[in-house]
Structures are given as C-alpha cells and as structure tokens.
Amino acid sequence: MKGNSTLNICKMSLLAMSLGLIGCHANQGATQEKNDRKEHLSSDQNLTSFPNTDSSAENSIQTQKLDQSFQVNTVASFNEPWAMAILSDGRMLVTEKAGALKLFDPVSKKKLSVEGIPKVAYGGQGGLGDGTLHPNFNNNAWLYLSYAEAGKSNQFGAVVIRAKLDLTQPNQPKLIEQKRIWEQVPKVEGQGHYAHRLIFDEQAKLWIAPGERQKFDPAQDMKSNLGKVLRLNDDGIPAQNNPFIQQGGVAAQIWSLGHRNPLGIAFDPKNQLWVAEMGPQGGDELNLITKA
C-alpha cells in the first residue's frame, strides 16, 4: 500500500470486513514473487494453458441492477489502516501500518493515539498488522497485536504481543504489561506475505495465520511456522489436541499447512474456520480449514 488511504467505517458489518480483506499486495512483492516463481519451476514441468474467453460471450452476459439496501457514511479517516477491533462500548481500535494504534469514538468523533506501541518494521507489506481482543477483554483488558520486526542481516519476521489496554486516563490510552507470545520462524529476507491474521474461537484459543513470506517451501516445512494456520492458547503455548503436538517445537503450533498469504480469517455460525488467501495475479482462494 502506497501513501495514505482513507478507511470508510460503515454502519453495516460487511463480510469483507469480517474476513479482514483490507490487506494490500505491494507491487515490489508481486514482482519479486513472479521472479521467484520462474526460478522455482523446473524445465520439465508442464504448464496447462487455457483459451481466452471469447469477447462475444462476455458481451452476452445478462446483468441485473439491484436496489441498494444500505448507506455508506464516512465517519473518520486513517493513514494506511490495516485492522479494526470494536470494544463493547462501541469505540474502535484501528491499526495503522506505519506503527500507530488509534482509539476512535464514533459518537464523539474523538480519535486518540494509543501509547506504548512497539517499534515496527514499516515497508513493503510490513508494519503494524492485526489486532484482536481477548474474549474476556472486559475483565482482563488483553489486546493482541501482530506486527513486522527487523532481525539481523536484513531479515524480517512477524511477531504477536499481548498487552493490557489501559483506559484509566480518558485522554491517553496506553498499552501496559506487554508480553511477546509468538514469532515467525525463521526470519527471512523481503517484506512480503506476513499475513499474521489473528482470531479467537469460542474456547478462547488464539488462531494465527502467518504467510509463507513469498518463499514457497516453508509452507510445507514442519520446522517453520510460515504458511500455516496455527492454534495456540491465549498465552502463546501450543494448544492441546493440535495434530502435531507430540512433535514439539514449532510443529506443535500447527493446525493446517500449505498456505500462501492468508489475509482473511473468520468463524462462521457453525464455528467452522474460513481463510481467504491472496493468489498471484488472480487465483484468490476461500478455504475451509480442517485439522491436518
């Protein structure tokens, strides 16, 4: 995402927002991935081509105009907004990719900056990412944030922290008692496909969906948590009954593997987990996640 953008917060919860589809595929990341893919394909692989759609067929498609049953009202603007979490009193926490967390009141229109945000590695698709509230937030005030951080030798990786959102000072919210509970393994070069989406289920298990960082192979590597869907306790410890819990290490975190860039994650009314994954120049996927 380049420059500043405006987030239109609607009075209606759209499915796209619930899936968190507000990520952006950076141009440089797409170019790098295209080059990596060419190198990754061996000369003996056969690629199937499909005929172009006939233009006359396209022109014959029947369309129907539907009455608009909702209204969109812009109530606030943010710089590169990435995620939003709504408190029980209606106030909104909005992450901004460059490293700011805003607390916005849609009634008073007051927007406050939250203090205590960790330093993020801002660039490419990296920065401050997702934010979600603990299911028992009203009692424990735990907020979970994901973000990109710099490592050694120009390597980067995603991190998840847990912190308490201190609202005792009405005009100065802040994060206290921060604890790092998860990180991508390993850190790699490049700043694409962090994904790092967060969601809690009904049992207060934390699900994390990290991307494969445009490196292909880690998505199938059991010694890496890149390109996976992970299931953890609320303190970051791997949850019992995970399919590879007996292997220990990073493998114990894994619920599902072989993912690319999971930018949307949501549970449906049947408590089934769905993940939306961004494809390369098309080919996006909506996947029902089941135990590996």
Residue ranges and their predicted role:
Residues 186, 191-193, 241-264:
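Short, surface-exposed recognition loops and adjoining beta-strand edges that mediate ligand/DNA contacts
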Residues 98, 156-157, 219, 223-227, ...:
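A detector of repeated loop/turn-to-beta-strand junctions in beta-rich toroidal repeat architectures
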Residues 21-23:
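C-terminal motif of bacterial Sec signal peptides marking the signal peptidase cleavage site
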